[in-house]
Amino acid sequence: MEMRVQDYGADIKLMDTSFAYIDGTFQAELPAGDVYVEMTKGFEYEAVRKKLRIESNQRELKLEISRFTDNRSKGWVTADTHVHFISPSTAILEGQAEGLNLINLLAAQWGDLFTNVGDIPQGPLTSRDGETVVQVGTENRQHILGHLCLLGGRAEPVYPMSAGGPQESYLGDALWNSLADWSDTCRERGGLVITAHFPYPAAEVGAGIVLGKTDALELYPDFGEEFNNLRFLYWYRVLNCGYRLPVVAGTDKMAAWIPVGANRTYAHLGQQEFTFDNWAKAIRSGNTFMTSGPLLFFHADSRAPGEEITLGAGGGAVEVQAEARSFVPFHRVEIVLNGRVVASREERDGVREMTLREKVQVNGPGWLAARCFSKVGLTTSWDLKVLAHTSPVYVQVPRQDLFSESGAAFLMTLIEGAQTWVETLATRPDAERLHRIRKMLSDARDRLHQRMHEHGIHH
């Protein structure tokens, strides 16, 4: 199996340009004369690109980079939920250089190869200033049912790390585990369960959502135009069925052609101490946003993402506010209600700051969120677009339940597809394990089927 990995040092190649990660000091041989320097430090600093004059006898050079906002001082923690193939100490250096507070470094199985497993028993590694932490978890993978980021969990790997599937488990390996089994084990240890690179692979994703086996969905800004992207559209379908799942983001970094935190999560801890457990609690509470550049903050009737608004019968007007700042220009901010744009503001030439305030009419139960988009183009070889999206503020209306027929049909298709695959194509394990997997999928189907009938949807 071909593996394109980074396990040799701290450098990065963005498109055709190579960079080095440094801790604030470095030595380099430079020619006398004009040279160009480029510096970045994540999403809260002004990027620098300028020409310098190097004198023939010069031995020292001082370079400065300025911070235009400090969200850590406002109670926010920024994290990459999904990183592979670097050592914890290298992850600390790269995380500090990218302005990250938390890197979730994931051990994984790749056929006969196991990576970063030996880093798990030592527990988290913390930078000297206490502001950057590397937490080693696992990515547990099944090539049809799906992948999970299992974070935290008392520094114990969740075995088996893969179950069936070429390039994931052993050749010819049986379906020993479902994603639900892995999720339950991680949660029993106090860990956080994230559906990796939602929704692919997709088969058990629907069952996991219906049974409440996942804490958040990891989204990538890659496919499609702007938010016309199946990752976001499928998330909207899930939300429209009343399943409250916040958004997170990670890079799935596997080599030096993508920086840690190029796609990242912001979570609001407020006055709580920065620990992994408090970060996981903040993720579950839902005050998060994912971003590949812009910093996006949202309130609806002064409620933050993850919180509820209760309206009277028939709904009412809700005052929404979105604020965005970015180290690169962006062009539009939007408010979405149940996935539909209900307010927007656009600057055709691009801006670095924008605020959108509106009153929107909400006639029934649902959710509100903010999103913003830049037209500056792709930022990495993984085709990441520049955008941000908040988790929702939820709207309650008496005696009405949020449920979507098309969303339910989507989830049911996933569940029934998983059942068909297990029965016809999967390499079967022993009878007891097979029964447990069958029962899990059957329970998910029955639960969704019951909700559909409660809403007059015949299936």
Predicted features and spans:
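C-terminal functional module detector
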Residues: 1-29, 34-70, 201-203, 236, ...
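Catalytic cores of extracellular degradative/oxidative enzymes
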Residues: 74-247, 251, 257, 276
